[in-house]
């Protein structure tokens, strides 16, 4: 990628990457190129001078989104979906059919919510919770994408190549077509959706005593946001009317999550409670501010639920000898541990662990000491 600038009476291309050699553009006359036009070149021959052709004109460099477009092209991000994928998508139903409902546990009678950020557009997990004499029954519902995306289909192969959705300041480049990610595979409110559900029995001490994992059917009652759930948990009257239908569920979920969190801390779980930076753009797509997004307990509730569901699934896969990649954390670098000890010493904080054999619990206690 690069930009054309007019120098005297000639348009000169300035590449974003310095190739240390002149560039010849074979098809410049085929495009309407003006001063400050951003474009993408394909290299035809690696020689001196470099032989290229224009493959895309992105627009003027100051126009909204052109800088992001250039970055995506520069990093070979797959943006568009080909015709084979579009044809497969057209064949997919955008509503749950009777055939889809077969062989699924029906959880549509459960009060169910999604909780995500204000700007979320696709919802891939939902929560239900009940209370009984032993404690809680927690349901984590995950969108059953595999029901719609079949192995070795064009959509599946494209998702494999993309690996993940890419979240940018002004857009999302999805792993799946929007008809799936924002449509039939998104757990939108007031519609039936196919899911995989991890149903977990949790005692009053926050211990998961049993679980089951089943194909399921849900019907989300409400799309909640972290900001408003946090407001509800803080007894803000401005959200009571909007969340009246799911208030009991959210308060029950809060109690359950706190017991899960306490159990995690007993095991030595480390809570770094880091803040995420969010770039604020103006109407022209230019960055004007960077704000820190703080995590309230609503975010922590969902985190606790998802971690527990992941642990249950990992245990299930392990107990059934199914191949799986487990996400684990390596032991910390001893040099960094000694650096940490040096900083703690400067702060006059007491170190009560052996740097050569540090445990997660040790880091947790140190963080607790210095959190103020």
Regions found by a protein language model. Give the residues of each.
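Covalent nucleotidyltransferase
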Residues: 130-132, 172-234, 242, 252
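Append "with occasional cross-activation on large, charged helical scaffolds in nucleic-acid assemblies
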Residues: 201, 213, 226-372
